Amino acid sequence: MLRPVGKQRVAEEIIDQLRGLILKGSFAPGDKLPAERRLAEELGVNRASLREAIKSLEQMGLVKTRQGDGTRVLDFMQTAGVELVSHHIPTGGKPNLEVLRDVLEFRRFYGREVARQAAIKGDDEDVRRLEEVADRAADPAIDAEALMKVDFEFYVELTRVGRNRVFQLLINTIRSAVLNYSAFFVTFNPPAAVVRKNQRDIIKAIEMQDGERAAQIADAHLRKGADQVLSVFKGQPSA
């Protein structure tokens, strides 16, 4: 289950291994990690590096160390923060359908609400900046992966326009979670013309300060994309 780590980035590698095992359920909530000496031997590291890694895992809300009891795994769904999302998603191989569904559901909710807020709070300068992003999507030479990233950045810019600090910090945190699935999203990208129309229609709604219209456009666009992706994996076992 555990494997020796390399000499470089020792603490980071320990964190990666233990975090991965906790997220996969190899260590369940309430389980006690092996004793420090044994765990250090299995990983092939010194105890100082192991302590550093355990401290980081505690800060993430994954484990809790108590004197006389050792280090126990916590229920991360109750104790961890949203920054854990990007680590909960595989960067290669088959996606976990449950996590993919959650990411797409969040993306739809997030896109709808930031479009609404952007229309309510946006000004002429915001419209100009959104148009600059939309112009990149209009490049006839743009490839599918670049188009997907530009479309995501359009929604990041909408978040800035909406001026909600929580949304801005949240999207900074989950950006890698979304982009880790880029290989799957690219496959189901709508045609460039559809992406451009969606972006232009949202910009027009912002110019008209029509929050409901902006939200409806974003929701329809993101719902269709999510349905296409999930329809392919429906009925297949998760990773």
Mark where each language-model region is:
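Short, charge-rich amphipathic alpha-helical segments embedded
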Residues: 223-237
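Conserved amphipathic alpha-helical segments that form helical-bundle/coiled-coil interaction surfaces
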Residues: 103-184, 195-204, 213-227
